[in-house]
């Protein structure tokens, strides 16, 4: 057996990552040769690369499980579903940014390349089967994200957002690494199957529990979950709106995939030890997300607290520690992706001339100037509030049902109560759009915004008619972890 026979089979399962890597390198060369004139070409090229990578993920058999790179990289049903959601989020983020950057003459070809590079890290996070691979994917995603956050370098708010994100991100990476070192020290392995085997043969000591706590702290930062959420409102508000839309979508999918993979894949035998940590994070995130958003006037800041609360609801499914719980997490994240992208498509459409608007009051009377836009945003808000028969209701139903089945009745009740509280600020937005005095009309939506908003609206409004495909895919993803 020659070297080619050894290496080439190992590359097959990582085909989506390879496509993105080669595509990013080609786009960098093209951009460097053409300069700022290449911005449109690089953007279109990045969209094509993401579509090809998405096709390569979708075309893989959903039920198969393959490991490669000495077991550090796994491709199973869970990885495929979460990679699909991640790439959809990245694609939508590029579509949302394309028209705005062209209008504001932000002619920098690096942005779409950074999205592609960040996507490589996110796909690795979803397929990581050991702590080292997980950290490498996480850092690749984060390094690109730090630059993206401060991409509008002439804007003080954008620069401040990038700096805050970088400093706190470096702190969280250190905590994750320290936790990983403790886990390795007390189990003798960094691979998830090796950790599982070690925990079968020995009791989980205090050192291992401490390691799990630090790992949980590291992943909680990437999820923007309480108490490691402090960067989220400022970064969401300060970053350019297309960047905020990206942060609220694709990285959330990858971070949740990483979190589920770590706790279900590496620590299934010590559920009692980490379940309490996840329950605390879920309750704190739901409570803060619901109450802190009530007084917000800036839509991007409100969406930041909304994302914190939604992460808390998704973590209810993980806290259950069961197959039904993981299925609920996958369904929740898929629907959350649609709701968030739809909401940001409307926010990006709030434009008159060269001025962008992003406060809640700027939505006054939107139903009279842009009835279709108001209807779509109202559906997103009602869905985020969990009002039936919209998709958001079913997302919460699946995670609450999993929690009750696992005996976490108090957690489910707290989830319902915080949902009722959170409904206030979602319904307030609808009230402002339909009952307040109208302002001057905004400009027509750009084509990219229309595509994202239409697709999101279809998912949110019509999910109850055909829920089977998503639920079945989520079920297959969950079974691959158990």
From Swiss-Prot:
What are the GO BP annotations of this UniProt entry?
ATP synthesis coupled electron transport
Q: Which residues cross the membrane?
A: 10-30, 44-64, 77-97, 113-133, 166-186, 206-226, 243-265, 277-296, 302-322, 328-348, 374-394, 397-417, 451-471
What's the main place this protein lives? membrane
- Which keywords does this Swiss-Prot/TrEMBL entry list? Cell inner membrane, Cell membrane, Membrane, NAD, Quinone, Translocase, Transmembrane, Transmembrane helix, Transport, Ubiquinone
Q: Tell me which InterPro entries the record gives.
A: NADH-Q_OxRdtase_suN/2, ND/Mrp_TM
Instruction: Give the top-level enzyme category.
Output: translocase
A molecular function annotated in GO for this UniProt entry is: quinone binding
Which cellular components does GO assign to this protein? plasma membrane
Its membrane topology is listed as: Multi-pass membrane protein
Q: How does this polypeptide assemble, per the annotation?
A: NDH-1 is composed of 14 different subunits. Subunits NuoA, H, J, K, L, M, N constitute the membrane sector of the complex.
Give the family, as the similarity comment puts it.
Belongs to the complex I subunit 2 family.
Protein name (Swiss-Prot/TrEMBL): NADH-quinone oxidoreductase subunit N
């Amino acid at each position: 057996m020659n070297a080619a026979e050894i290496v080439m089979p190992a590359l097959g399962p990582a085909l989506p990552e390879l496509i993105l890597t080669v595509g990013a390198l080609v786009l960098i060369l093209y951009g460097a040769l053409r300069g700022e004139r290449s911005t449109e070409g690089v953007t279109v090229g990045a969209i094509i690369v993401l579509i090809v990578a998405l096709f390569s993920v979708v075309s893989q058999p959903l039920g198969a499980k393959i490991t490669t790179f000495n077991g550090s990289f796994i491709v199973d049903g869970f990885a495929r579903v979460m990679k699909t959601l991640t790439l959809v989020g990245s694609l939508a983020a590029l579509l949302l940014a394309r028209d705005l950057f062209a209008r504001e003459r932000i002619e920098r070809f690096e942005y779409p390349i950074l999205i592609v590079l960040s996507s490589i890290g996110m796909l690795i996070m979803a397929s990581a089967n050991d702590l080292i691979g997980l950290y490498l994917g996480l850092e690749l995603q984060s390094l690109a994200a730090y630059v993206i956050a401060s991409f509008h370098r002439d804007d003080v708010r954008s620069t401040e957002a990038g700096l805050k994100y970088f400093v706190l991100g470096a702190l969280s990476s250190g905590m994750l690494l320290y936790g990983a070192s403790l886990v390795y020290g007390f189990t003798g392995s960094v691979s998830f199957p090796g950790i599982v085997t070690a925990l079968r043969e020995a009791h989980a000591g205090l050192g291992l529990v401490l390691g799990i706590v630090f790992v949980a702290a590291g992943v909680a930062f990437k999820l923007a979950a309480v108490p490691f959420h402090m960067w989220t409102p400022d970064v969401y508000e300060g970053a350019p709106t297309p960047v905020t839309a990206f942060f609220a979508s694709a990285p959330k999918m990858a971070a949740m995939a990483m979190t589920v993979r770590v706790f279900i894949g590496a620590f299934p035998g010590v559920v009692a030890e980490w379940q309490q940590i996840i329950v605390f994070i879920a309750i704190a995130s739901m409570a803060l997300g619901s109450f802190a958003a009530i007084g917000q006037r800036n839509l991007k800041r409100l969406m930041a607290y909304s994302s914190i609360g939604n992460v808390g609801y998704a973590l209810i499914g993980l806290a259950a520690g069961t197959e039904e719980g993981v299925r609920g997490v996958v369904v929740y994240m898929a629907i959350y992706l649609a709701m968030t992208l739809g909401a940001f498509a409307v926010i990006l459409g709030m434009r008159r001339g060269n001025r962008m608007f992003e406060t809640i009051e700027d939505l006054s009377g939107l139903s009279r100037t842009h009835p279709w836009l108001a209807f779509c945003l109202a559906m997103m808000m009602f869905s985020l509030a969990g009002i039936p028969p919209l998709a958001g209701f079913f997302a919460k139903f699946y995670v609450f049902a999993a929690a009750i089945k696992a005996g976490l009745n108090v957690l489910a009740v707290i989830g319902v109560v915080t949902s009722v509280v959170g409904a206030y600020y979602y319904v307030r937005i609808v009230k402002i759009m339909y009952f307040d005095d109208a302002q001057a009309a905004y400009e027509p939506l750009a084509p990219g915004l229309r595509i994202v908003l239409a697709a999101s609206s279809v998912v949110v409004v019509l999910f109850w008619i055909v829920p089977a495909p998503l639920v079945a895919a989520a079920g297959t993803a969950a079974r691959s972890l158990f």
